[in-house]
Curated annotation (Swiss-Prot):
Motif (Microbody targeting signal): 509-511
Source species: Homo sapiens
Name of this protein: Peroxisomal N(1)-acetyl-spermine/spermidine oxidase
Tissues expressed in: Widely expressed. Not detected in spleen. Expressed at lower level in neoplastic tissues.
Induction note: By polyamine analogs.
UniProt subcellular location: Peroxisome; Cytoplasm
Length: 511
């Protein structure tokens, strides 16, 4: 059904629907609800909770982050940091000027201890030497940002090519050379977690430097990241968010009539899985890219323009999971913050097919030591890619047994007490997420993220701004982050404000 070319009279203001109650959706809703031009706004959330990929759970006697973990770049230019500060969710250290001025370059700090698969500890001096090499090469990738062409398509291939040249100049014995390569391989696995990808060979080289790192030493929320989205929820009028309301299809570019609104026509009608329909003048879609890709053929009617659909298929979207292990007593030192795992028979210069069944755990980068809860000690492991997705298919008992064996092996202590319990994220299996976050894949560019962010209809035919797009995968320089997601929600809210705000008394948008 063709759109009438106008949103009609819209008595009392436009009807706006936000699909998805993550930080992008809540950010858009909060921005619009604060304005008198938008009295009719609903957020449709598929699950029973708000927050999306921000998910804090009470466990082990404290709070753990099943989803987003850190504020990346907590400084004045970061809206998540600013909002958290306004809500009083951060401590004195996190708010300190000193913390905000730290330049990390986006790189993870050095491990406190590095365990090798033979049961020996790796020299931290050797680890630091390899970290300097690896992150120096990562920084070098920025040279290709505006280059007409790149020597190889991917970040992984570039790193391996450069490392190969360095290896040729190494003068140590064979055993030390192999250990250096194994340590480098663990940094590759870590970078896969950072980028949310199975392999750095999948990450495009040219646009890699477009991702922008903000100053500030990454920090956490002592009482849980979800405290932020809870505060945002509390700022919305009651019943704005409708829970357990998954959307099936967004029908757009039409002239839809609803019995509840006699005499009105709407360019969009949102059909939910339970059969309910919501008419709207504007819909802000904030669902994760993984979900969008899986349901691309049925989520929009008519289908998305070919160019936008192609961008959705090309942008990368992978899995990074966490495995929490609870211990009665710590086997690590009191000042330990990060435990690195190094598999001595691995090398980034050797392409090995993933052995999911027997060796999925070798992709695990190690463990972050969480702040001790009341007499409880917890490690948080990170694992990305196909191995991470395979881990989701295992039982808790299988994961616990496997990682107990790994820890006994690398510490050289066959009597190391097994963890008391395990908790895992399963972002790939989550039906409304289907992964963790986006990256710019080989074959795509930052332009694809901009293309995904463009509202529909794109040609100006029909009512304006029927479908708008937000979420971390729509932010060209802050993709994969909560601050990118929040900014994208604000961006789309501002599009509607610029259309409607001057029309508060005469609610008809400029056409």
């Amino acid at each position: 059904m063709e759109s009438t070319g106008s949103v009609g009279e819209a008595p009392g203001g436009p009807r706006v629907l936000v699909v998805g109650g993550g930080i992008a959706g809540l950010g858009a809703a909060q921005r619009l609800c604060g304005h008198s031009a938008f009295p009719h706004l609903r957020v449709l959330e598929a699950t029973a909770r708000a927050g999306g990929r921000i998910r804090s759970e009470r466990c082990f006697g404290g709070v753990v982050e099943v989803g987003a973990h850190w504020i990346h770049g907590p400084s004045r230019g970061n809206p998540v940091f600013q909002l958290a500060a306004e809500y009083g969710l951060l401590g004195e250290k996190e708010l300190s000027q000193e913390n905000q001025l730290v330049e990390t370059g986006g790189h993870v700090g050095l491990p406190s201890v590095s365990y090798a698969s033979s049961g020996a500890s790796v020299s931290l001096q050797l680890v630091a030497e390899m970290a300097t090499l690896f992150y120096g090469l990562i920084d070098q990738t920025r040279e290709f940002l505006h280059a007409a062409e790149t020597p190889v398509p991917s970040v992984g291939e570039y790193l391996k090519k450069e490392i190969g040249q360095h290896v040729a100049g190494w003068t140590e014995d064979e055993e030390t050379r192999k250990l250096k390569l194994a340590v480098l391989n663990s940094f590759f696995n870590l970078e896969c977690c950072v980028s949310g990808t199975h392999s750095m060979d999948l990450v495009a080289l040219a646009p890699f430097g477009e991702y922008t790192v903000l100053p500030g030493l990454d920090c956490t929320f002592s009482k849980g990241y979800q405290g932020l989205t809870n505060c945002m929820m509390a700022a919305l009028p009651e019943d704005t968010v409708v829970f357990e309301k998954p959307v099936k299809t967004i029908h757009w570019n039409g002239s839809f009539q609803e019995a509840a609104f006699p005499g009105e026509t709407f360019p969009v009608s949102v059909e939910c899985e339970d059969g309910d329909r919501f008419p709207a003048h504007h819909v802000i879609v904030t669902v994760p890219l993984g979900f969008l890709r899986e349901h691309l053929d049925t989520f929009f009617d008519p289908p998305l323009p070919a160019e936008k659909a192609e961008a959705i298929r090309k942008i990368g979207f992978g899995t990074n999971n966490k495995i929490f292990l609870e211990f009665e007593e710590p086997f690590w030192e009191p000042d330990c913050q990060l435990i690195q795992l190094v598999w001595e028979d691995t090398s980034p210069l050797e392409d090995a097919a993933p052995e999911l069944q027997d060796a999925w755990f070798r992709k695990l980068i190690g463990f972050v030591v969480l702040p001790a809860f009341a007499s409880v000690h917890v490690l948080c492991g990170f694992i990305a890619g196909l191995e991470s997705e395979f881990m989701e298919t295992l039982s808790d008992e299988e994961v616990l047994l496997c990682l107990t064996q790994v820890l006994r092996r690398v510490t050289g202590n066959p009597r190391l007490p097994a963890p008391k319990s395990v908790l895992r994220s399963r972002w790939h299996s989550a039906p409304y997420t289907r992964g963790s976050y986006s990256y710019v894949a080989v074959g795509s560019t930052g332009g694809d993220l901009d293309l995904l962010a463009q509202p529909l209809p794109a040609d100006g035919a029909g009512a304006q701004l029927q479908i708008l797009f937000a979420g971390e995968a729509t932010h060209r320089t802050f993709y994969s982050t909560t601050h990118g997601a929040l900014l994208s929600g604000w961006r789309e809210a501002d599009r509607l404000l610029s259309l409607w705000a001057p029309q508060v008394q005469q609610p008809r948008p400029r056409l």
